[in-house]
């Protein structure tokens, strides 16, 4: 296969940076669904530095799926590792460079002490490979936060962070300068960590010593296990001025400043010692203001002093200026000195201790305090002359009070008797009393009723809205706003009952009819074949709306069915507008958004109402998915005004239609339904189609918020789950919709998945694939992975039962489940299940059921009078059959000669008029029947080609070859008089029109080839060297790995290269030159018929990335047309012309679309009456006969090719030359005042008001070698991300107008369409939305640019790992990848043998091993033929043994190899239990060559 590509220019080699497939894939619609945007907390750059403004969480589990770096704030005594307790965790997502510089605003008013030399200690423990790069990522985030002035100088700072499975915390006493800590201590730790050995389970740094008090202590700790208990324990030690001991440690000396004197110097100042050494510098003896306050006392009361962190009785006595004996006398309680608490008041003289307890306020409310980072009931009580029991008693009615065991940071609590306070605001609260800006109510007992949720949804104790048990279960433990551990509780609109309303007079049975079904390969239904007795309402889906709000039905088959639809009797005939594709495709999504606005709603409503009235229909159904939706992939977020606009539009529409029916479709998820003012809408319209199907599907993959109890959204769940359907019915009826107006969705199709494990088919078992790509088997007719009709399911059950492994009713979901071909799992509803559901919905007072869709239920024979479905479809597309009820017609085309007015050489009429008057449609129908009869017979000699046989039947010349372009082609223009037309010839004047159409189609393809292989080839060949010199100083290697990327580009380029040319060509043809609706319809249908097939050919060329799949046969066929880069499209269109005239049913269908109604023949745009014939123009025969492209046609192809070529090739060449371009998501808005600081060295672009940068991790992230020999003494900056070579030229003035912004925005759109994840597939040009966007030369179409996108934090972590593990650079998506640990083995080819028993290790323990080593540089070098247990946690051990020396003495395995195996087995083994065990064999690196390695997972 190599010779095919040898010699091809580097510019053609396409990068892995191009498009993602199934555009606008559906999104989740289950009641619990939340968008991908909710996986991580709000960005730090948005929330600001104050933790109380960050997102709030009640446990760490809700943050486990965020793969970004996060900063946390929580109380020191809040044990956040305790999964059985309730917590308050403040969190924000750190992208890198999140903090503005506010350091000057915190400069203390008092002059700092002079500079001191101090000793910093770095300590660590070593057990297994470490993650210094993750450590550094968190240190950098904390350093920036501290150094830029975001800690208060008036109080001790405690801050926490997490990145992946690395946790960290920083403690800074309030007498230390934050700038010193950030720029000296933490920066030195970052620098030194580059030289660590990669084996640190924990890393700690402290400034602490025997003479330090807690105000002068600094500490940092990072752990590799992702927990915080040890960090909080360290903070408690430092807050008591207790230093930590380490297994290993080193020290370095640096300078710092103290903003107040240490207690040790104060003690010395009150004795005979003049000073004491602390950190190597004499500290002056001086009493601070803080230490001297409260020394004066009133009569009868003692003078007091306040206990500081780390104090002793001796230290306090010194500050009091009294002896130890006197201090003991004044404070004589037993064991007094062993029970000192920070904040506690003590006596410094004789007398009674004053009462410092606060008093209630004048209005009767209690005195309050806000709980600080390091405060507990104990410290608060001590500071206020109270006991813990007092605190607990005061707060029995305080919002959120759960007792002293676990008080939360920033809580407002009572420290006196009195009525409870207003709770503290929570920045992201949506409901309840903690919504920012909430005013104090008159009745404090009604706090829970404040700020109710939209749709009357449940409000949990954290102020979040939802409709599932997680939000709606009240687990109050006493005080208002509390919940039991492990729950979120509920404070308002609790419960999940369905509100039963007024049942309808007649229970509705609604059916949807898919008018677009005839685009399938099989499974058809004429609308007359619908069992009308089953339905009260029949919805015809869908009718088109243009961008100027005109109504039409553009598809001929749909138009034919619509005419039949108008004649049905029985059910109400409802016409539907919208649908998922219409609502979400780039070309149409704005129609509803703008059409319902105040400026346009009257026009849109009037046009729809007129269409309904003119066609004598019974009503209209609007399916907008969805107003105000925040996260439709590839689309800007919907505006919040859209819901009310929709309501106002429906009011106008209903007023215009009067007694006729108006309905809408609505989603079953709170996430999307909250954009609808659904209660108000329900009062305007007649009923709501409630879409309780598609609750789940492939789109759930990767979203932890899509499926209850499923951490990654990839569990096998029914799309018609009964439990979730009831939750949805509760949602909509609680929202205020009368149940009698709710028509509940049922389905006649299933959603299918490819199972991970053939033996695991329950709701916790997993499926494979990504959100945009299903591995489920496609059925023949629906032809969509993940989607299969009931008809196809029943066909399997009835006629292919040997393929069915399981078939049963799942009682929990009340769904039919079928497993077939071992690993295909599908959930669906049989007629029996639908009948059960119908009875239940009737009992609940619902308004009816709606079935999607009638045409999916069973296979139907072609209607009476039609031979078969292909024949009927062909006739529908040709327009030769008249809808039933309009009368029959007979053809007369053979009776019309060349002298007919409509057949003269100079056309006097429009193409459509000529076609119809000469009965060309009848001629075409007869010719096709004759051809099929000829085609299907056995022939002894050579069979004529399709075009040759048609010519023969028409009386034309022989040796015709319209299906070829090369030198052997022959498809001439033939005038009417040259055909053998006359009595008995079975031909007529229509022959010329049909043959003119053939010629025009052949001419178009020939001109395209002419332009492609001559002019464009010359241009590209002349500019390739400039491309390479500008963007790639090092040429790419010539290897087979590029094959898939080249073919991706060929596939992508079809609509861009061919589309523009054909678009221009068609617009010159008379039938498509006017701006009329008919002309536009002709243009759209012909363009689709021409280009859909080449796009399919191009897509099918891609195959797989295995070079062995590129067979010699494929190569030979492809090589005939591919010599240079342009020949890819030359082959595609040459092959497509061959297919177009091959005489198969599919080709005939395409030709019928192209030539029907005279779309390819001559004529004038509009008929002119005969007397005005002098105004008519004669046709130019010479121009019509040319097959060489004109200059303008060459320019059209050149523009399309070069735009696609440069846009695709430039990122490809960067990558081919060893660079790794990626997009930095700065997290900043485009109007951020500090944004320019981060864009001065890198090219940037804005998308949806967010700033992104194009960057390259060139070279080493930290290129320094340490040779100074002093820990902490080496200053070496990290490398900055680089710009890409030649990027300055991408300013839109060259390279076909390509701009840096196009590369950035295109990559970001791809990333967003893939659910904010990298790695989405290449674009599918057979998708109509993608095709149209590419045809418009939109190189930012999602997927065309596929550079990875991530935060600077993640990118730098991967970059640093690559310094030590070069293979990391070869990982997909580098540097935005997470799987960048060291690897030596081919885990993808490992064998897996499960041996799970009741005594096997816990899966969770094995996954902790993953947490501990994921992304690390860890590796093991072990002797062969010896068993080793190399990774352990809890009950789980991962062991290895090299087998058979094969010249090796040692074998290597890396951390990533272990991670890959444990991840795979944790998904495939255990079968729903919590344990797993087993073994396998794989190939790994030996010290000489590849080595067989046996691995095992077993109990320790």
Swiss-Prot record:
Keywords: Carbohydrate metabolism, Chitin degradation, Chitin-binding, Disulfide bond, Glycoprotein, Glycosidase, Hydrolase, Polysaccharide degradation, Repeat, Secreted, Signal, Virulence. Residues 1169-1193 have a biased composition (Basic and acidic residues). It is found in: Secreted. The keyword rRNA-binding does not apply. GO terms for cellular component: extracellular region. Its EC number is 3.2.1.14. Disulfide bonds join 431-459, 453-465, 458-472, 490-494. GO terms for biological process: chitin catabolic process; polysaccharide catabolic process. The LysM (lysin motif) domains are small globular domains involved in binding chitin in eukaryotes. LysM12 contains one LysM domains. This is Secreted chitinase LysM12. It comes from Penicillium expansum (Blue mold rot fungus). The gene is LysM12.
């Amino acid at each position: 296969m190599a010779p095919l590509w040898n010699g091809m220019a580097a510019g053609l080699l396409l990068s892995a940076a191009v498009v993602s497939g199934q555009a606008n894939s559906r999104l989740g619609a289950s009641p619990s669904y939340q968008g991908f945007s909710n996986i991580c907390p709000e960005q730090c750059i948005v929330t600001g530095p104050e933790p109380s403004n960050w997102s709030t969480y009640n446990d760490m589990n809700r943050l486990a799926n965020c793969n970004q770096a996060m900063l946390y704030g929580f109380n020191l005594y809040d044990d956040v590792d305790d999964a059985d307790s309730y917590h308050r965790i403040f969190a924000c997502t750190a992208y890198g460079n999140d903090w503005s510089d506010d350091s000057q605003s915190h400069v203390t008013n008092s002059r700092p002490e002079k500079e001191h030399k101090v000793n910093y200690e770095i300590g660590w423990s070593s057990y297994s490979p470490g993650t210094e790069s993750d450590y550094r990522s968190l240190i950098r985030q904390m350093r920036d936060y501290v150094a830029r002035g975001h800690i208060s100088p008036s109080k001790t700072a405690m801050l926490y962070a997490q990145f992946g499975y690395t946790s960290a915390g920083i403690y800074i006493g309030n007498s230390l300068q934050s700038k010193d800590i950030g720029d000296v201590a933490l920066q030195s730790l970052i620098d030194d960590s580059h030289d660590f050995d990669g084996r640190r389970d924990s890393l700690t740094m402290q400034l602490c010593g025997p003479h330090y008090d807690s105000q002068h202590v600094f500490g940092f700790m990072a752990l590799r296990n992702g927990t915080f208990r040890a960090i909080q324990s360290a903070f408690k030690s430092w807050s008591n001025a207790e230093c930590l001991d380490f297994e290993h440690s080193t020290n370095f000396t640096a300078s710092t400043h103290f903003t107040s004197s240490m207690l040790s110097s104060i003690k010395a100042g009150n004795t005979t010692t003049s000073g004491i050494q602390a950190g190597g510098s004499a500290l002056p003896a001086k009493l601070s203001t803080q230490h001297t306050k409260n020394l004066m006392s009133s009569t009868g009361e003692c003078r007091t002093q306040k206990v500081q962190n780390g104090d002793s009785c001796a230290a306090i006595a010194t500050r009091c200026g009294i002896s130890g004996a006197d201090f003991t006398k004044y404070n004589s309680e037993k064991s007094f000195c062993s029970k000192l608490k920070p904040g506690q008041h003590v006596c410094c003289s004789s007398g009674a201790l004053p009462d410092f307890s606060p008093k209630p306020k004048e209005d009767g409310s209690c005195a309050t305090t806000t709980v600080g980072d390091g405060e507990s009931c104990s410290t608060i009580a001590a500071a206020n002359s109270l006991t813990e029991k007092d605190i607990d008693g005061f707060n029995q009615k305080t919002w959120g009070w759960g007792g002293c065991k676990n008080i939360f940071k920033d809580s407002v609590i009572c420290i006196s008797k009195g009525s409870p306070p207003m709770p503290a605001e929570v920045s992201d609260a949506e409901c309840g009393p903690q919504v920012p800006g909430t005013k104090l109510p008159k009745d404090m007992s009604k706090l829970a009723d404040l700020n109710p949720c939209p749709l009357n949804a449940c409000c949990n104790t954290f102020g979040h809205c939802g409709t599932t048990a997680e939000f709606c279960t009240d687990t109050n433990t006493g005080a208002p706003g509390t919940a039991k551990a492990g729950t979120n509780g509920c404070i308002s609109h609790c419960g999940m009952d369905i509100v039963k309303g007024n049942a309808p007079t007649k229970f509705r049975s609604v059916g949807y009819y898919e008018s677009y079904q005839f685009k399938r390969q099989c499974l058809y239904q004429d609308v007359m074949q619908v069992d009308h007795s089953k339905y009260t309402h029949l919805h015809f889906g869908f009718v088109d709306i243009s961008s100027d709000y005109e109504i039409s039905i553009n598809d001929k088959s749909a138009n034919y069915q619509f005419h039949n639809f108008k004649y049905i009797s029985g059910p109400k005939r409802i016409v539907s507008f919208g649908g998922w594709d219409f609502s979400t495709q780039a070309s149409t999504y704005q129609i509803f958004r703008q059409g319902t606005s105040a400026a346009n709603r009257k026009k849109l409503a009037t046009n729809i109402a007129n269409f309904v009235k003119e066609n004598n229909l019974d009503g209209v159904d609007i399916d907008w998915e969805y107003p105000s939706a925040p996260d439709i992939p590839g689309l800007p977020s919907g505006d919040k005004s859209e819901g009310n606009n929709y309501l106002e539009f429906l009011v106008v529409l209903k007023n215009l239609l009067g007694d006729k029916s108006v309905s809408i479709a609505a989603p079953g998820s709170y996430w999307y339904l909250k954009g609808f003012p659904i209660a108000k809408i329900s009062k305007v319209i007649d009923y709501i189609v409630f879409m309780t199907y598609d609750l789940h599907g492939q789109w759930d993959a990767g979203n932890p918020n899509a499926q209850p109890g499923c951490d990654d959204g990839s569990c096998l769940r029914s799309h018609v789950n009964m439990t979730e359907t009831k939750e949805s019915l509760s949602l909509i009826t609680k929202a205020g919709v009368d149940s009698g107006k709710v028509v509940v969705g049922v389905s006649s199709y299933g959603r299918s998945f490819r199972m991970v494990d053939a033996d695991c088919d329950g709701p916790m078992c997993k499926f494979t694939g990504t959100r945009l790509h299903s591995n489920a088997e496609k059925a023949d007719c629906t032809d969509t992975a993940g989607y299969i009709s009931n008809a196809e399911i029943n066909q399997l059950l009835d006629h292919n039962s040997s393929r069915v492994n399981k078939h049963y009713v799942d009682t929990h979901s009340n769904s039919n489940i079928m497993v077939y071909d071992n690993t295909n799992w599908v959930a669906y509803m049989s007629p029996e299940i639908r009948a059960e559901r119908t009875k239940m919905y009737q009992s609940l007072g619902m308004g009816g059921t709606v079935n999607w869709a009638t045409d999916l239920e069973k296979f139907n024979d072609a209607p009476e009078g039609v031979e078969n479905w292909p024949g009927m479809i062909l006739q529908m597309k040709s327009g030769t059959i008249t809808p039933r009820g309009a009368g029959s017609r007979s053809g007369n085309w053979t009776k019309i000669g060349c002298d007919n007015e409509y057949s003269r050489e100079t056309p006097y009429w429009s193409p459509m008029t000529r076609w119809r008057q000469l009965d060309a449609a009848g001629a075409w129908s007869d010719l096709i029947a004759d051809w099929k009869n000829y085609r299907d017979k056995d022939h002894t000699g050579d069979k004529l080609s399709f075009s040759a046989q048609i010519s023969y039947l028409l009386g034309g010349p022989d040796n015709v070859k319209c299906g070829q372009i090369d030198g052997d082609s022959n498809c001439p223009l033939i005038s009417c008089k040259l055909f053998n037309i006359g009595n008995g010839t079975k031909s007529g004047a229509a022959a010329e029109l049909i043959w003119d159409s053939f010629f025009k189609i052949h001419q178009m393809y020939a001109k395209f080839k002419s332009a492609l292989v001559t002019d464009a080839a010359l241009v590209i060949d002349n500019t390739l060297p400039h491309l390479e010199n500008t963007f790639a100083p090092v040429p790419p290697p010539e290897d087979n790995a590029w094959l898939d990327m080249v073919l991706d580009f060929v596939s992508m380029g079809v609509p861009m290269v061919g589309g523009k040319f054909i678009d221009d060509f068609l617009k010159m043809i008379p039938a498509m030159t006017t701006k009329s609706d008919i002309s536009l319809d002709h243009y759209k249908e012909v363009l689709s018929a021409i280009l859909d097939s080449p796009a399919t050919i191009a897509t099918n060329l891609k195959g797989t990335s295995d070079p062995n799949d590129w067979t010699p046969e494929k190569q030979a066929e492809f090589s005939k047309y591919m010599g240079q880069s342009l020949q890819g499209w030359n082959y595609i269109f040459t092959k497509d012309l061959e297919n177009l005239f091959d005489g198969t049913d599919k080709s005939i269908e395409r030709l019928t679309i192209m030539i029907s109604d005279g779309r390819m023949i001559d004529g004038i745009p509009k008929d002119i009456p005969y007397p005005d014939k002098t105004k008519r123009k004669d046709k130019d025969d010479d121009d019509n006969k040319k097959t060489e492209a004109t200059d303008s046609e060459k320019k059209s192809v050149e523009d399309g090719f070069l735009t696609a070529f440069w846009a695709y090739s430039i990122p490809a060449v960067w990558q081919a030359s060893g660079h790794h371009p990626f997009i930095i998501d700065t997290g900043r808005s485009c109007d951020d005042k500090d944004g320019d600081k981060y864009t001065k060295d890198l090219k940037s672009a804005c998308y949806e008001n967010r700033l992104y940068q194009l960057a390259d991790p060139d070279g080493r992230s930290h290129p320094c070698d340490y040779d100074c020999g002093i820990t902490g003494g080496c200053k070496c900056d990290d490398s900055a991300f680089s710009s890409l070579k030649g990027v300055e030229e991408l300013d839109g003035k060259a390279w076909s107008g390509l701009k840096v912004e196009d590369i950035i925005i295109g990559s970001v759109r791809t990333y967003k369409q893939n659910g904010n994840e990298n790695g989405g597939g290449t674009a599918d040009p057979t998708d109509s939305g993608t095709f149209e966007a590419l045809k418009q030369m939109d190189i930012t179409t999602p997927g065309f640019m596929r550079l990875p996108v991530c935060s600077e934090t993640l990118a730098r972590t991967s970059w640093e790992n690559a310094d030590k593990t070069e293979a990391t650079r070869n990982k997909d998506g580098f540097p935005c990848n997470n799987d960048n640990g060291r690897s030596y083995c081919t885990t993808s080819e490992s064998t897996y043998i499960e041996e799970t028993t009741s005594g096997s290790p816990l899966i969770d323990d094995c996954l902790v091993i993953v947490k501990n080593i994921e992304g690390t540089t860890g590796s093991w070098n072990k002797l062969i033929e010896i068993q080793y247990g190399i990774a352990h946690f809890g009950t789980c051990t991962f062991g290895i043994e090299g087998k058979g020396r094969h010249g090796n003495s040692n074998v290597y395995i890396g951390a990533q190899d272990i991670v890959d195996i444990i991840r795979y087995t944790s998904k495939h083994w255990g079968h729903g239990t919590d344990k797993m065990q087993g073994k396998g064999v794989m190939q790994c690196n030996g010290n000489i060559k590849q080595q067989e390695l046996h691995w095992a997972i077993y109990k320790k």
